[in-house]
């Protein structure tokens, strides 16, 4: 009987599962002028998160700087319908026709409210992509980690010492 009670309690927790946005994914190679799907990656989380809006930008990899968007590609309202969802969100963006072949950083900034107290947060994600002759079907995902004694920060495919 106690097993059934525990099972029922666990099942009720699963139904209350929350989610948050944990990164972005974009085609590894993009063609200038193409409309592409930017994937906003989600994951399960321990508390509720209200995602308000996300904006995307692009910069040449050589001049990209963490936490900036550079040339704006688009911004999207997320709101209640796209908050706390455990399936990825797709947003359309257009790669500027003016981009010459080479390596670029596509960045995103996300404004969210965390938990019962609605604590505001801005999260930044980025992915290094190549501008080439055609848009690939292979996607690359942002990464975030803070290094140890080297104080190395890796943000979405490019690394800078701090």
From Swiss-Prot:
GO terms for cellular component: extracellular region; host cell cytoplasm. Glycans are attached at residues 88, 126, 133, 150. It comes from the Eukaryota. Changing residue 125 to A: Specifically reduces the interaction with N.benthamiana SERK3 and its paralogs but not Arabidopsis BAK1. Secreted effector that induces necrotic lesions in Nicotiana benthamiana. Interacts with the host receptor-like kinases (RLKs) BAK1/SERK3 and BKK1/SERK4, inhibits their kinase activity and suppresses INF1-induced pathogen-associated molecular pattern (PAMP)-triggered immunity (PTI) in N.benthamiana. Also interacts with the host receptor-like cytoplasmic kinase (RLCK) BIK1 and inhibits its kinase activity, thereby inhibiting PAMP-induced ROS generation. In PTI, phosphorylation relaying by RLKs and RLCKs is critical for the initiation of downstream signaling. The C-terminal region from residues 103 to 132 is important for BAK1/SERK3-binding and the host cell death suppression. Belongs to the NIS1 effector family. This is Necrosis-inducing secreted protein 1.
């Amino acid at each position: 009987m106690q097993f059934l009670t525990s099972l029922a309690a666990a099942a009720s927790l699963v139904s209350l599962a929350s989610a948050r946005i944990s990164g972005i994914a974009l085609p590894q190679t993009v063609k200038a002028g193409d409309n592409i799907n930017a994937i906003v990656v989600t994951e399960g989380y321990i508390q509720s998160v209200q995602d308000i809006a996300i904006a995307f930008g692009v910069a040449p990899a050589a001049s990209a700087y963490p936490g900036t968007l550079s040339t704006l590609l688009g911004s999207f309202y997320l709101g209640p319908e796209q908050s706390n969802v455990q399936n990825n969100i797709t947003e359309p963006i257009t790669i500027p026709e003016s981009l010459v072949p080479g390596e670029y950083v596509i960045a995103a900034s996300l404004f969210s409210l965390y938990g019962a107290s609605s604590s505001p947060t801005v999260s930044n994600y980025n992915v290094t992509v190549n501008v080439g002759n055609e848009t690939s079907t292979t996607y690359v995902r942002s990464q975030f980690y803070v290094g140890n004694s080297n104080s190395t920060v890796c943000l979405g495919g490019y690394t800078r010492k701090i």
